[in-house]
Amino acid sequence: MPRISLAELAEQSFGTSLEQLDDRRIYKLLVKLVQERSAACPLNNGKKKLYYISAEFLIGKLLINNMIDLGIYDEVKDQLVAAGHDLNKIEEFEVEPSLGNGGLGRLAACFLDSIATLGLTGDGVGLNYHYGLFRQRFADNQQKAVPDEWLGEQDILIDDDRSYTVEFGDFAVTSKLVNIDVPGYGQPTKNRLRLFDLASVDEGLVPGSSIDFDKTKIAKNLTLFLYPDDSDEQGRLLRIYQEYFMVSNAAQLLIDEAVERGSNLHDLADYAVVQINDTHPTMVIPELIRLLTTEHDIEFDEAVTIVRSMVAYTNHTILAEALEKWPLASLQKVSPAIADIIVKLDEIAKAEHGDPRVAIIDEYDTVHMAHMDIHFGFSINGVAALHTKILEDTELRPFYEIYPEKFSNKTNGITFRRWIQGANPALASLLDDVIGTDWRSTGDLSKLAEFADDKDVLERLAATKVKAKAIMRQFMALEQGVTIPSNAIIDVQVKRIHEYKRQQMLALYIIWKYLDIKNGNRPKHPVTIIFGGKAAPAYTIAQDIIHLILTLSQWIANDPDVAPYLQVVMIENYNVTAAERVIPAADISEQISLASKEASGTSNMKFMLNGALTLCTLDGANVEIAELVGDENIYTFGASSKQVEQLYADGSYNAGALYLKPGIKLLVDFITNPAFMATGNTERLQRLHDDIKGKDWFMALLDIEEYIQTKERVLADYEDQDAWMRKALINIANAGTFSSDRTISQYNDEIWHLS
């Protein structure tokens, strides 16, 4: 590639010098540069192609990430600095795409980056949501959901002339396709994220300040929102319509491209492999069978055999509520043809395996999507060693007994290019100086461990944390209106709001810490506890947890005895951009889900990679982090997954009995303290109090005492900064296992077999 001269580009595009350009015009200049460089990259073009189908792709802003992958980041940054410009300020003009919500979508984005970086032929396939999940706003210490209008001026979407017809039960719709380029780091080639949209979509269905809309107008609303509210029958139907629209387009695209590459479709499995990312794309199985039989004259039995050899399924959850189940009658309404094929597949599964526990359609005429994936896919993987073992031993045990050869573990990973180079350039520079630059492509950080007792390296590592905290404080002041003390310990829990992730347990700790400070026990360093995450609009208790956190934040800020020592912040509309500011600044990584409930987690990996110490239960990938760094470099607490499973199995967990312990009762009852209730919403606080006291399904009260003790030990250990930074270095040095390049290599070697 020719050398870049931003000065020449500025003169050509705007007739002025680079120094004279404002940040907005420089942003436009950089977008054009990246587009041209990316357009010049040919597509990966192997015989066999991966289609990674996912309801979510939480891709984040792409300008800096793509410059890193295209190999022009340092050159561009240096020229901008020389001209008096700040790339981070320029990036603020980029709007973050709203195509995902949490870990599922961010994992998919990291995977696409790694697939391209390894030079593999593989595209992501999903939907182009006009308003995303929603934009989160806070008012009256409560979450308000408004449309996330991100599509206005989008420079990353490239129109594709492909269009398909999707036939529903009593009407049809037409799709249109847009692509996002995915260049590979250090590669001359690229892949794409293929996003299907509804040609007839009508944004006018959505009032400006509400996410409520007419769910019955399927031909106009299908691609408006990610995960539309499914708390009523029409919402559940809309979800099914949306999922079928996604997979029908994906299947038609896959077949067309396979034929273009030379397939006669009898050999389709030699040309295409599908990775189903969670159960949302499951209907691609019957849809591929339908297309092969009705459009391409392949016999049904052969079509089933073909599809069985080309579809793989990733399970992301242990929660029964998240293993999708749909009424057969609803599927029949959306697509009678697909429902008929599902009935036939169920008959095949029942003929092969009589155990009713593994039926696709149960005695209540409910279709279990994961069961279809397992019977008619050739691979099933979990996403952390513990998660996969739980699937094999308990949650999916009947299937594991039938198909042990199908099951494997593929521990999740993250792309180091974004989460070090992009998010924490000071740390990237330190790593380059100390261990060389190969870590960007190899993911190998292990050489850093040789410097665990090197005073100079530890001091430089501490300096990178100081710099990251300064960037985070600036972000919080400008974007969130919050001032964070420069000497604060930064304690962070950022993830989707859900009872199993136990934000409510951290809230109980905050109450304990507040009361402890009121009693005169002042910490040596102020502690800032940062939350971030959205609650599903229909998930009442999660909304109540947000309200408790925001009310605690206000209560503590207004108490002059406590405010100098304890601060609670909840980031409004937490997204990838916020993550890139907060994660590098964190001292403590809160990974406190109830053991056995978190499949893997990826924020735990990002925090570890950036030198935060993990405070965790032995759940998901936390188990693997603990094994890698050793007990002395991580802080674990809580009941084990086996203990938790036993409590569920015998029904012996008694929240009410634990509540009666004086120390616990004090914390829970603080929520309904009359003065505190007067600050918040009485109904929300009373409901959450009663739920924790009487139900506590995810056992916050089981672990709260040990959690408080362990957390206080973490805060005490922070005071020995030499020992703390040594632990941080050991964590970074052992994070290489969690490179998504490693994960994708494993997927390819053991599942996809792409050349």
Indicate residue ranges for each PLM-predicted region.
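A conserved ligand/cofactor-binding region detector
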Residues: 1-755
